[in-house]
Amino acid sequence: MPRNISFSMTTPQFLDGSKDVTRRMGWTHLKTGDVLQAVEKAMGLKKGEKIKPLGLIRVVNVRREPLNQMCADLAYGEKEVAREGFPGRSETDFVLWFADSHHCKPDAIVTRIEFERLPIDVKGVPQP
C-alpha cells in the first residue's frame, strides 16, 4: 500500500494537471521510482471524514534544496512556481506563502519532489 501524500493546499492544481512538482518539509526518505497515493487531506480530518484519494503518483526526481533558491535564480524560480501550479505568481510570493504555511524560514532546506501521475485503466486500476 503506497504512503499517502496530501495536496490539501493545492488540490485544484493537482487535479487539473498543472502541478507536477511539490515541496515538502521532511520527506527525506523518498527515492526516484517510489509510488505514493495522492490524497486531498491526510491530517486534521474531523470525526466521520475519510481520506479522499486523488490518484497514484510516481516520484520522477527528488532532491533537497533551499526554498529561496527560486528567488536566487529567477529563471529557475519562474519555471518552478508554474510547475507548482501557480503560473504568473512571483517567486518571492510563492516562497513567502510556503514559509508562512509551513512555519519555516524562506531559506529552509526543503525536499523538492517531481512526480508523474500514473494512468488509470478502465477498471480504475493504476498502470505502471
Protein language model features and the residues they cover:
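Structured alpha/beta reader/binder surfaces that contact nucleic acids or chromatin modification marks
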Residues: 1-128
